[in-house]
């Protein structure tokens, strides 16, 4: 099951480590998902923000939104929808970063950053509620590029994959 959490349980709350967020939400593993902004001095998710069926940031959807439906399906909704539209469609969580790596089983490449190697965090869906999480860092390793991630997700049979916030967050 894929679940989400806000930093310390609040939108724009104090910064919280991933391990603390996992522990306080009864999780087993955790990763950072969405890009965030420190404009208020506290981390707030950028763009559309639905967490556990509650709408926090009601922005229009864009190409960079990943949605998780109540039935466990992960997808990127059409551009230009509002949060109320996603809630009505059964969306329980959204994430903002991107790009989409695989959609309907097909690679969604290339992009400007396709060939660059960075620390990465990404999620793939084999089928609803059957996910693959991918996290790399660059301690003694150059990281992954988008093609590498697509190939890894395809090897697990993912029909959808999405690049989450990586870099220092990974």
Name what the model sees in each region.
Residues 1, 25-26, 68-73, 128-129:
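Short, solvent-exposed coil/turn segments at beta-strand boundaries
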Residues 1-59:
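Zymogen propeptides
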Residues 7-10, 78-85, 136-140:
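Short, solvent-exposed aromatic-acidic interface loops
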Residues 24-26, 61-63, 96, 118-120:
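Extracytoplasmic
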Residues 28-32, 65-67, 75-76, 124, ...:
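Structural recognition of the beta-strand scaffold that forms the well-ordered cores
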Residues 35-39, 83, 119, 138-141, ...:
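Solvent-exposed loop/turn segments at secondary-structure junctions
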Residues 36-113:
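Active-site-adjacent helix-turn-beta-strand microarchitecture at beta-sheet edges
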Residues 94-98, 102-159:
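Domain-core and long-helix interface of multi-subunit machines
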């Amino acid at each position: 099951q894929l679940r989400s959490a806000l930093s310390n349980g609040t939108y724009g709350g104090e910064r919280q480590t991933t391990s603390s967020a996992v522990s306080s939400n009864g999780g087993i593993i955790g990763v950072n998902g969405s890009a965030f902004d420190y404009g208020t001095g506290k981390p707030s998710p950028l763009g559309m923000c639905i967490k556990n069926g509650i709408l926090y940031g009601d922005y229009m959807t864009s190409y960079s939104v990943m949605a998780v439906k109540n039935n466990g399906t992960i997808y990127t909704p059409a551009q230009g929808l509002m949060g109320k539209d996603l809630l009505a469609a059964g969306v329980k969580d959204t994430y903002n970063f991107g790009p989409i790596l695989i959609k309907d089983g097909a690679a969604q490449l290339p992009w400007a950053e396709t060939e660059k190697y960075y620390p990465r965090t990404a999620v793939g869906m084999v089928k609803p509620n059957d996910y693959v999480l991918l996290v790399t860092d660059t301690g003694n390793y150059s990281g992954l590029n988008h093609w590498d991630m697509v190939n890894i997700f395809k090897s697990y049979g993912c029909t959808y994959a999405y690049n989450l916030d990586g870099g220092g967050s990974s």
